[in-house]
């Protein structure tokens, strides 16, 4: 007789198969970050150096401004313009200054601090960021991407070179705040999932999300 008790380690829901087993979660430590066209050269070597020195990264945070419509005896709310909050990327500095060189190149693209001159247009310094969650593969068993946020129109909003201290055993780090124009989410096969996926858009006025059933 098979042991089926593991299917009960779940959350009871309504309908058939209410005790199906839990889904495998994505793991926070299985990830990588690529900064495409980051620095002056935008070469693959510079991108790889930065990717290898990543400590942590925050994923995109999206919010909608609130629109209030006043009415007789009441009010209703609509979703206004959206805002993508900056992500935070922490990099571990290396003794050969490879990371600092690439980061410095990118900041100099945005503003030349020696000559005190700025870029002609944003297209000359903006880059792209890819935040990918992996399946755990490595070496001969190559890693597969199961989720990717692709951020476009990126620039360094702030660079924090952090702290030095005698009482610590930790490496030196640099923290970048990266502002971006838009973010799209992809799945394992580069299919659009979540944000960016094609959804049916109603062209007729209708009342949605207001009916209560049960």
Regions found by a protein language model. Give the residues of each.
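Glycine-rich, low-complexity intrinsically disordered segments
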Residues: 1-214
